[in-house]
Amino acid sequence: MQGTISCARNYNMTTTVGESLRPLSLKTQGNGERVRMVVEENAVIVIGRRGCCMCHVVRRLLLGLGVNPAVLEIDEEREDEVLSELENIGVQGGGGTVKLPAVYVGGRLFGGLDRVMATHISGELVPILKEVGALWL
């Protein structure tokens, strides 16, 4: 079963619980604050284009590790606006240029699919996820 909610700017937010999806609350003041708040409130969030296969791969990997990532799917016409907001968050969090799919861990830009896969293969991903409270094992 899948559930999403739309906010004013056509961003759809979902968070996974096992194989089901439940909506996240997006009640904030401004449009830039909406994305910032969602990034800061979730231990792990995956942000990508609607229907992006790489976003799906990241999500499935994290689910396989026992992490329940929030997922932000954006429409192509809003992509530039969201990327601009994410780069502002990334600058404060020590990040840089944001490319989709983007994974934020502990409110900071972690990277994309390549970084997630590389840290998983090297065995560094699980300790990072434990450190931010996304895993309790």
Swiss-Prot record:
It is found in: Cytoplasm; Nucleus. InterPro entries: GlrX-like_pln_2, Glutaredoxin, Thioredoxin-like_sf. Residues 32-136 form the Glutaredoxin domain. Interacts with TGA2 and TGA6. It holds the Pfam family Glutaredoxin. Disulfide bonds join 52-55. This is Glutaredoxin-C9. GO terms for biological process: jasmonic acid mediated signaling pathway; negative regulation of transcription by RNA polymerase II; response to salicylic acid; salicylic acid mediated signaling pathway. Belongs to the glutaredoxin family. CC-type subfamily. It comes from the Eukaryota. It comes from Arabidopsis thaliana. Has a glutathione-disulfide oxidoreductase activity in the presence of NADPH and glutathione reductase. Reduces low molecular weight disulfides and proteins.
